[in-house]
């Protein structure tokens, strides 16, 4: 049996075809979405959990070496890896919030798969993380289906996050493919996420149109100009319908990070001075919220940065504020900070102003964020997104008849306004912002696996 599988940066979802229509399956708490989060007692627990409780093979030398190190480490630390040691989605977030110092937590593993300079053991670790999530998702889907799931069309961005170009894309897709096969999928095919979103929209068209798909996901923005319509449905070879593509490593997570940096970090002393009037360095505050940047997070949570923060507290004109950043370092609160910014971004899609409260850092710590503040904070990443729209059109040398906007950030009035200003007079359509890619992947799975 086949599925469409959106292994997303922000959320994961699965769809099957029933009576000619895609149907998303339940993943967690009666929702069709599983937030892309995972927690465990230690990083090493994930590898042992796969082997000990799910008989997932360690196929090559690097994954075997990782497994041996993991088992040895967990034994030395007296950590008993049980069937429930690894949690996913909101369950993992709840455990992390309850005890951030004792829980190893990761959000959006997909963000790191195309990172440059990953060592073989780091690639093996990310493969295990992805495999664990895919295994869990496959099990959730399997419980709702009568036949064994063996085939999947998995979505991928035009360009994964990372600076390595084609090499980064090959690295990331390789991790996804190996992880999927270790998780039990025998046949795996990849499809570009904006193309998949377009396929779902195509099902509503009565005539051929040039459709500009703008898919703003958690980690990437992907744009495709596609010829779509009844005559293209069910055609395995659609090369002639693909007019232009572009993609950049800017997505919803980057919007959340930018909002946290500009609007929340000043509460923690960013922009302050020493007693001598010298500006404090900005980098520690940026690294604290750059949750999709492995080197930045490693640097922030290093012992050397802990010593630097001690020095900054000692020298700052407002040491009590910088001490709050020190608390973020000590209690590993980066994800909670960015999560607070995300909640404000979502709220500002329907209200003019919202209050950001950070009681997990300090009881009274709060600030108001307005639509104007949001627009100012997001100006740079938004400009990058609009560049990709223009690049896709330049590659195609054609104008769209309609814009199909999808992805988790598609609901933002700010983004719709910017697109309308860039392409005046062209209608903007939307669908299921969180499910259109998954539905399109299921439609494509029906074409390739039927």
What residues fall within each predicted segment?
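Phosphate-binding glycine-rich/basic clefts of nucleotide- and phosphate-handling proteins
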Residues: 35-40, 64-65, 228-360
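Extended N-terminal export/anchoring regions of large proteins
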Residues: 20, 29-76
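Intrinsically disordered or highly flexible coil/loop and linker segments, enriched in small
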Residues: 118-119, 146-147, 269-273, 343-354, ...
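N-terminal phosphate-binding loop and flanking beta/alpha elements of the actin-like ATPase fold
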Residues: 1-34, 70-213, 229-248, 365-366, ...
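Conserved Rossmann-like nucleotide-cofactor binding loop
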Residues: 10, 219-221
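Short, well-ordered loop/turn and helix-capping segments at boundaries between secondary-structure elements
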Residues: 261-270, 421, 425-428, 443-450
